[in-house]
């Protein structure tokens, strides 16, 4: 099929080339022979009057022109897929749909385990690919490379729809043998202790408590940086260090690690975990079904138990 002289099948080839950045892999993805894919590149170059790709070893490196085309082409193909091709009724009991979800280790442990357990009963062939925090999660949504983001709402873009899951609070944690935590934690003591903190993505972006402290001009003595909240408790074991993490996750680790949970010396703001999906998935039956499951399970979470142990005072 042609539109203004362009064979629309070439857009499928271009999308595969941008995704794979390798001629053989892109050809395999769309069931073309390697010579046919080479011919498609030649026709694309002729139509767009741009080299589109240069070779670096076996890697195809896109030109600025190809980069500019990639987003609109991917969006157009996704709209065609969702609006025309995927119009059949969605039956979760028969579906083998794979959902790609970006979320933190905190949300994986305290929330998404519930989703996986429920889906195993209701839709046993549905699969999940859980991905770590990306430096550009909104861009992955726009390109249709992920189905959902589950993140603190303040990190989400306004370009895509979203829904609130539940509120969470931050607490300080340390090893149960840490005698500095037997008394109320003062700000001076908090500042003087060595901290273990979680940062996310390749750029090691600060987490919520660090954003809050930086906004107030406060700086801690960070001794260890880890990729995710769940790595904080093991680093605290048998040390005088302290960490800050979501209360529900601290309660989870408290059950099987010698962890002491204490109130921070200054009130850290509550944050809202939310789910976001691509705008073009709004009417996708599979996405609608999955969103319903997520919201139902979130409503069953209840509130985290904030009652902390009584500590001796000076």
Curated annotation (Swiss-Prot):
Keyword Calcium carried by entry: no
Alphabetical list of Pfam families matching this protein: HTH_1 (PF00126), LysR_substrate (PF03466)
InterPro entries: LysR-type_TF (IPR050389), LysR_subst-bd (IPR005119), NodD_PBP2 (IPR037416), Tscrpt_reg_HTH_LysR (IPR000847), WH-like_DNA-bd_sf (IPR036388), WH_DNA-bd_sf (IPR036390)
Residues of the signal peptide: none
Keyword flag DNA-binding: yes
DNA-binding region listed in the record: 23-42
UniProt-listed CDD domains: PBP2_NodD (cd08462)
GO molecular function, one term: DNA binding
PROSITE patterns documented for this protein: HTH_LYSR
Alphabetical keyword list: Activator, DNA-binding, Nodulation, Repressor, Transcription, Transcription regulation
Record domain HTH lysR-type: where: 6-63
PANTHER family xref list: HTH-TYPE TRANSCRIPTIONAL REGULATOR LEUO (PTHR30118:SF6), HTH-TYPE TRANSCRIPTIONAL REGULATOR LEUO-RELATED (PTHR30118)
Family: Belongs to the LysR transcriptional regulatory family.
Miscellaneous note of the record: There are at least two nodD genes in B.elkanii.
Function: NodD regulates the expression of the nodABCFE genes which encode other nodulation proteins. NodD is also a negative regulator of its own expression. Binds flavonoids as inducers.
Protein's UniProt name: Nodulation protein D 1
Source organism of the structure: Bradyrhizobium elkanii
Gene it is expressed from: nodD1
């Amino acid at each position: 099929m042609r539109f203004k002289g362009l064979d629309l099948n070439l857009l499928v080839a271009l999308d595969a080339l941008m995704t794979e950045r390798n001629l053989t892999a892109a050809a395999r993805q769309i069931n073309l022979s390697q010579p046919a894919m080479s011919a498609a590149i030649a026709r694309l170059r002729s139509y767009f009057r741009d080299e589109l790709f240069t070779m670096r070893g076996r890697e195809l490196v896109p030109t600025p022109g190809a980069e500019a085309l990639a987003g609109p082409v991917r969006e157009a193909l996704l709209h065609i897929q969702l609006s025309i091709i995927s119009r059949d009724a969605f039956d979760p009991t028969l579906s083998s749909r794979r959902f790609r979800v970006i979320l933190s280790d905190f949300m994986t442990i305290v929330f998404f385990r519930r989703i996986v357990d429920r889906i195993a009963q209701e839709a046993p062939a549905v699969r999940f690919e859980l991905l770590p925090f990306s430096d550009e999660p909104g861009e992955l949504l726009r390109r249709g490379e992920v189905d959902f983001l589950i993140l603190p709402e303040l990190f989400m873009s306004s370009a895509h729809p979203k829904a609130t899951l539940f509120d969470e609070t931050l607490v300080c944690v340390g090893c149960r043998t840490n005698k500095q935590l037997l008394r109320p934690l003062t700000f001076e003591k908090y500042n003087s202790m060595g901290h273990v903190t979680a940062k996310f993505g390749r750029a090691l972006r600060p987490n919520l408590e660090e954003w809050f402290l930086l906004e107030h001009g406060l700086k801690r003595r960070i001794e260890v940086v880890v990729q995710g909240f769940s790595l904080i408790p093991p680093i605290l074991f048998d040390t005088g260090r302290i960490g800050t993490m979501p209360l529900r996750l601290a309660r989870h680790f408290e059950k099987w690690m010698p962890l002491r949970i204490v109130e921070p010396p200054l009130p850290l703001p509550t944050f809202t975990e939310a789910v976001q999906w691509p705008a073009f998935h709004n009417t996708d039956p599979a996405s609608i079904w999955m969103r319903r499951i997520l919201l139902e399970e979130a409503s069953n979470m209840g509130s985290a138990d904030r009652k902390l142990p009584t500590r001796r005072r000076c």
